Amino acid sequence: MKIATSFIVTGFLCAIVFAAETKVKIEDLPAQVQNTVKEQTKNAKLVGVTKEKEGGKTVYELETMANGKSRDLMIDGAGAIISVEEEVALESLPAAAQSAIQKKVAGGKITKVETVTKGSDVSYEAAYTSKSGKKAEYGVNADGTAHK
């Protein structure tokens, strides 16, 4: 009985994880979200749109590419932009943020750097592969302190 219950719980948790994000066609989006998508993809290629629940509310993630750089936006059901993650060069970050990222990665390889904007809050995120080959991300504020 315990084994059967374990399998049921595991299956349920997997279903929740995989059901959390769903691909969506533009024509199936609410009108306000469609307008934001059109506005934000004028000079970019639309890679994909997904729908998910965050804090009990439906949000949409818009993935775009422009000039070889990724730009992802989180949009609420009213079409307002919640956050933007934009690929940038490490050298474009404030010196303290660059230094903190380089110190954290030490000997590993940075694979992607993004500016993350949520309202007036701006932080920076680096994806990297450690010396041991482990993939990870590290976020910092402009002053180099770790971002939560």
Would you name each region that the model predicts?
Residues S6-I16:
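Bacterial N-terminal signal peptides
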Residues T5-S6, K51:
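Amphipathic alpha-helical hairpins
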Residues A20-K148:
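Mature soluble domains of exported/periplasmic/lumenal proteins and thiol-rich metal-chelating peptides
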